């Protein structure tokens, strides 16, 4: 079978990571991994520059291999068919932007060869495949800057049906008068930490750094249960 190489890209609220993948056997090509940290609340220019840096670094490690396309795992809400950012609360500076066109511009890969899927769905389908496809049904959950979910039913990614929430999503599921992601995500840690200390942080790492530096250590230990 002919080797077919594509870029596998994971975009999250704090980073972009990419690696060359051989679709003929779904293997990762060693020494092609690239990652750049960038927060989702930055300006569109900063975010896109970070993405471009990671993609070009990965492509530079391809050692002359022809890259046929890009597969992008992207958090919801996002128009995965058109490749357009839709979120107000995450990557807000990118809302309405055609991400497919932007990625094509910086990589030279045709827009028609750039595909998107939900990041949690990509995780769930990958886990199902690596598990040897032994189980007919699987639920995958991702916890990070957001709260993602993937439902595998009879070996297929499902977004509707018995036991599957609308769109196959849990992040916007009603919970305690708000949505689940407000409680099960980085955003909740940031909000609760500010309530307990009066100090704003960005990301859980910021909270850990303060704790390791000794600041708020006593308060954090005393407040751990209510946190």
Segment roles from a protein language model:
Residues 40-52, 66-70, 76-137:
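Glycine-rich phosphate-binding loop and adjoining helix at the ATP-binding site
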